[in-house]
Regions:
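A short alpha-helical cap/connector motif
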Residues: 1-158, 165-186, 191-229
Length: 229
């Protein structure tokens, strides 16, 4: 799989996960089509039934968005990266590769703090990250991110929000004070689920809250926000 990483070992793992994700996407399409047909479809992607269904699914960030995460992390020299929603570790691999490459180039230390509420997913993520050779740059915290992220261990350079929508704003409330000046925050799918994300977008789009924010209208939309002084 060709990515911006230029890392054959990581790309082999990503290719396997991409294939697994494609198979699961077909299954997910059938699931949501059936729901629509039976008029039970809800726009709330975090409903109990949906949560059960996606419990063992990758629902990984799109490769282009992962490439962008890598590139932005490299651009700002990110060393402390936090991710809300690790799943099987796809985006984590990109983030960890960025931190590793920054450390290789400039020396010092760096870490990606992943968060995953499903212990089995966290185990699988750890195995995938190890296979990609990136374990020294990742710590996956198992549990509810609203708790596990209360102390990220220092000023955070980059935050990826890619998880269940109703929890994104509460996690942002935990993380905002821990972001360094100039930190970047990426939040996925804000256009596709515009209404559901309104509590989050109204926060980051209001300069009074200390952020400047833009929407990248691509594949469901990606909100990119910068923490100001
Ligand atoms: C969209 S997936 C993340 C995909 C991942 N970023 C990737 O690219 O592979 C969202 C993940 O968030 C996890 N999650 C849901 N609620 C959580 C919570 N309260 N704390 C931590 N993780 C949670 C889910 O189990 C799921 O695996």
């Amino acid at each position: 799989m060709k990515t911006v990483l230029c890392d054959a070992r990581a790309e082999a793992v990503l290719a396997r996960l991409d294939e697994q994700g494609r198979q699961q996407s077909a299954e997910m399409r059938r699931y949501y089509d059936a729901k629509r047909e039976s008029a039970k479809r809800t726009t709330d992607p975090a409903s109990k039934h949906d949560m059960d269904f996606v419990r063992d699914k990758l629902v990984a960030l799109d490769p282009e968005k992962c490439d962008l995460c890598y590139t932005l992390c490299r651009a700002i020299g990110a060393r402390r990266v936090v991710e809300f929603g690790t799943s099987f570790g796809v985006s984590t691999i990109y983030l960890a590769a960025a931190v590793r490459d920054t450390v290789r180039e400039r020396g010092g230390e760096g870490i990606v703090i992943g968060t995953e509420i499903e212990p089995r997913k966290a185990e699988i993520a750890a195995a995938n990250i190890a296979e990609a050779g990136l374990s020294p740059f990742v710590e996956v915290r198992v549990g509810d991110a609203r708790e596990t992220l209360k102390n990220a261990g220092g000023p955070v350079d980059f935050l990826l929000l890619d998880s269940w929508i109703p929890l994104v704003r509460p996690v942002m409330d935990v993380m905002a004070p821990q972001l360094r000046r100039g930190a970047m925050v990426l939040c996925d799918n804000v256009e596709k689920y515009e209404r559901e994300y309104s509590d989050y977008t109204s926060f980051v789009r209001d300069p009074k809250n200390g952020f400047r924010s833009v929407l990248l209208s691509h594949q469901g939309g990606l909100e990119i926000s910068i923490k100001l002084g």
